[in-house]
Each structure stands twice: as C-alpha cells, then as structure tokens.
C-alpha cells in the first residue's frame, strides 16, 4: 500500500461491495469485504488503465496520421492553409477567444517543444500563424486534436470523417479518466 497506492484510492474500491441493510451489529458494514480484495481490485484497475492508455496513445497517433493522409489528397491544402484558418478562428472566437493560443503558449518554455517554437515569432498577444500541420499536430493536446479534426472535416466537407468526431470525443473523455484515476 505504501509503495503502490494510497488509502484514499484503495478505500474507494469498497463501494463495489454491498452493505448489510438489516438493523443489528453489522448494519452499514460491507458484506464479505476483505483488504486482499481491495488490493486485487487496485492491481486490476492499474493494469486496465495501463492497457487503455496504450490503446488511446495508438488511437491518437492514428488520428494524426489520418489527418495528414487526408490532407495530402486535398488539392487546395498545402499543410498551412487549414491550420491558419483554425488558428484565426480560435484567435477571434466570441465565446473562448485564444483558448488554443493560450494552451500553446503555455508550452513555449517546455524543453520538448523548444525546437518547434524556435522557428516562430511567439508573442502571446499576436495571432499564431504559418505553423505547418505536421508540427501543429505535435503541439496540441488530444482534445485539441479532436477539435481540429472536426474543423478540418467540416472545412473540406469530409462527411465520412465528421461521423467519427463523436467517437473521438468519447475517447478523449476515457483518456482523461484513465490519466486521472
């Protein structure tokens, strides 16, 4: 317990057990609950989350490759156009202006992204532009990727792709649940 989990998480598994409802000395106590069961559930939970996370990472990679492959078959797309349109939309959004811009700017200081950002004039008050799609896809979160995929699908009237947006949104929710217990 001390090395692999904490009491709060372990105790949360007890909610999977029924309680005695009849008045008496056991009322409100869990039926057949044993610490070993909680430990087993914790291990199973960990392994399932690990497996799901690996699958979700593969799905995210698939979506990036899918977008790039679709883009290659669109004559008017050069890898910059749709990203510029999307960043313009984000910058001027009435409800959540600069939401994506702010998310990207938070990453500017990150060692992982420095090579990408070194090429661009990064100013928090200026609109981002002229980032090629193959780099843009690497600096956005999975949720932002799905939002971009939806925009991309609508921009180029890719009806078959638009059908998948709902599924990818559910996968983002699953990813967040897996990552945050």
Where are these regions (language model features)?
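Active-site-proximal binding-pocket segments
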Residues: 174-181
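Extended intrinsically disordered or low-complexity regions, especially N/C-terminal cytosolic tails and loops
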Residues: 1-172
